[in-house]
Protein backbone atom coordinates (compact mmCIF):
# COMPACT_ATOMS: atom_id res chain seq x y z
CA UNK A 1 0.00 0.00 0.00
CA UNK A 2 2.82 2.41 0.84
CA UNK A 3 4.28 1.94 -2.65
CA UNK A 4 1.09 3.23 -4.25
CA UNK A 5 1.43 6.51 -2.40
CA UNK A 6 5.15 6.63 -3.11
CA UNK A 7 4.68 6.27 -6.87
CA UNK A 8 1.42 8.24 -7.03
CA UNK A 9 3.12 11.51 -8.10
CA UNK A 10 4.57 9.69 -11.12
CA UNK A 11 1.41 8.05 -12.45
CA UNK A 12 -0.33 9.19 -15.59
CA UNK A 13 -3.78 10.86 -15.31
CA UNK A 14 -5.57 7.77 -16.74
CA UNK A 15 -3.96 5.67 -14.00
CA UNK A 16 -5.14 7.93 -11.17
CA UNK A 17 -8.34 5.98 -10.51
CA UNK A 18 -6.45 2.66 -10.32
CA UNK A 19 -4.01 4.09 -7.76
CA UNK A 20 -6.79 5.25 -5.42
CA UNK A 21 -7.91 3.44 -2.30
CA UNK A 22 -11.04 1.34 -3.00
CA UNK A 23 -13.33 3.65 -0.98
CA UNK A 24 -11.98 6.75 -2.73
CA UNK A 25 -12.39 5.03 -6.09
CA UNK A 26 -16.01 4.20 -5.24
CA UNK A 27 -16.71 7.81 -4.19
CA UNK A 28 -15.20 9.14 -7.43
CA UNK A 29 -17.32 6.79 -9.56
CA UNK A 30 -20.41 7.67 -7.51
CA UNK A 31 -19.77 11.39 -7.87
CA UNK A 32 -19.14 11.06 -11.62
CA UNK A 33 -22.39 9.08 -11.93
CA UNK A 34 -24.34 11.73 -9.98
CA UNK A 35 -23.00 14.57 -12.12
CA UNK A 36 -23.77 12.65 -15.32
CA UNK A 37 -27.35 11.93 -14.17
CA UNK A 38 -27.99 15.59 -13.36
CA UNK A 39 -26.51 16.76 -16.67
CA UNK A 40 -28.68 14.43 -18.74
CA UNK A 41 -31.94 15.07 -16.84
CA UNK A 42 -34.54 16.80 -19.01
CA UNK A 43 -35.89 19.90 -17.34
CA UNK A 44 -39.44 21.11 -17.95
CA UNK A 45 -40.25 24.63 -19.09
CA UNK A 46 -40.78 26.66 -15.95
CA UNK A 47 -43.03 29.63 -15.50
CA UNK A 48 -41.40 31.94 -13.02
CA UNK A 49 -43.70 32.37 -10.05
CA UNK A 50 -43.11 33.34 -6.42
CA UNK A 51 -39.53 33.86 -5.25
CA UNK A 52 -39.12 32.01 -1.94
CA UNK A 53 -36.62 30.44 0.44
CA UNK A 54 -37.26 27.07 2.06
CA UNK A 55 -35.51 25.17 4.84
CA UNK A 56 -35.91 21.48 4.07
CA UNK A 57 -34.85 18.61 6.32
CA UNK A 58 -34.61 15.19 4.69
CA UNK A 59 -34.76 11.99 6.77
CA UNK A 60 -34.12 8.43 5.60
CA UNK A 61 -31.24 6.98 3.55
CA UNK A 62 -29.79 10.37 2.66
CA UNK A 63 -26.17 10.25 3.83
CA UNK A 64 -23.33 8.35 2.08
CA UNK A 65 -25.35 8.06 -1.15
CA UNK A 66 -24.32 11.22 -3.03
CA UNK A 67 -27.41 13.12 -1.85
CA UNK A 68 -25.76 16.48 -1.12
CA UNK A 69 -23.81 16.45 -4.39
CA UNK A 70 -26.91 15.59 -6.41
CA UNK A 71 -28.97 18.28 -4.68
CA UNK A 72 -26.21 20.87 -5.18
CA UNK A 73 -25.72 19.98 -8.86
CA UNK A 74 -29.44 20.04 -9.69
CA UNK A 75 -30.06 23.22 -7.67
CA UNK A 76 -27.24 24.91 -9.58
CA UNK A 77 -28.65 23.71 -12.90
CA UNK A 78 -32.07 25.10 -11.91
CA UNK A 79 -30.57 28.49 -11.00
CA UNK A 80 -31.33 28.11 -7.29
CA UNK A 81 -29.13 29.37 -4.46
CA UNK A 82 -28.52 28.19 -0.92
CA UNK A 83 -26.71 25.41 0.88
CA UNK A 84 -26.96 21.76 1.94
CA UNK A 85 -25.31 19.97 4.88
CA UNK A 86 -25.30 16.69 6.79
CA UNK A 87 -26.71 16.69 10.31
CA UNK A 88 -25.24 14.58 13.12
CA UNK A 89 -28.49 12.59 13.49
CA UNK A 90 -28.20 11.22 9.91
CA UNK A 91 -30.56 13.72 8.29
CA UNK A 92 -29.64 16.25 5.61
CA UNK A 93 -30.73 19.88 5.80
CA UNK A 94 -30.86 22.45 3.01
CA UNK A 95 -31.89 26.04 2.53
CA UNK A 96 -33.02 26.55 -1.04
CA UNK A 97 -33.87 29.91 -2.59
CA UNK A 98 -35.46 30.66 -5.93
CA UNK A 99 -38.69 30.36 -7.83
CA UNK A 100 -41.25 28.10 -6.15
CA UNK A 101 -41.82 25.93 -9.25
CA UNK A 102 -38.10 25.18 -9.54
CA UNK A 103 -37.82 24.28 -5.86
CA UNK A 104 -40.84 21.97 -6.18
CA UNK A 105 -39.20 20.30 -9.19
CA UNK A 106 -35.92 19.85 -7.27
CA UNK A 107 -37.69 18.19 -4.33
CA UNK A 108 -39.68 15.92 -6.66
CA UNK A 109 -36.46 15.01 -8.51
CA UNK A 110 -34.69 14.11 -5.25
CA UNK A 111 -37.63 11.91 -4.17
CA UNK A 112 -37.47 10.05 -7.51
CA UNK A 113 -33.89 8.82 -7.05
CA UNK A 114 -33.71 5.06 -6.48
CA UNK A 115 -30.50 4.94 -4.40
CA UNK A 116 -31.91 7.55 -2.02
CA UNK A 117 -34.84 6.84 0.25
CA UNK A 118 -36.49 9.93 1.68
CA UNK A 119 -38.76 8.75 4.47
CA UNK A 120 -39.67 12.22 5.71
CA UNK A 121 -39.25 15.70 4.29
CA UNK A 122 -39.90 18.72 6.49
CA UNK A 123 -40.35 21.85 4.36
CA UNK A 124 -40.60 25.25 6.09
CA UNK A 125 -40.57 28.76 4.63
CA UNK A 126 -37.86 31.18 5.74
CA UNK A 127 -36.84 34.72 4.81
CA UNK A 128 -35.07 35.14 1.44
CA UNK A 129 -31.46 36.36 1.55
CA UNK A 130 -30.35 39.28 -0.55
CA UNK A 131 -27.43 38.91 -2.97
CA UNK A 132 -26.88 35.21 -2.30
CA UNK A 133 -24.80 33.57 -5.03
CA UNK A 134 -24.53 29.91 -5.92
CA UNK A 135 -25.38 26.74 -4.08
CA UNK A 136 -22.89 25.28 -1.59
CA UNK A 137 -22.27 21.99 0.17
CA UNK A 138 -21.26 22.83 3.75
Region roles according to the model:
Residues 2-138:
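Intrinsically disordered, low-complexity, mixed-charge
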Amino acid sequence: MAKIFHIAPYIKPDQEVNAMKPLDRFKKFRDDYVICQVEKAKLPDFEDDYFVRRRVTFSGRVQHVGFRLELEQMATRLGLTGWVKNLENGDVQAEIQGYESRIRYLLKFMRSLKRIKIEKMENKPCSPKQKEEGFKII
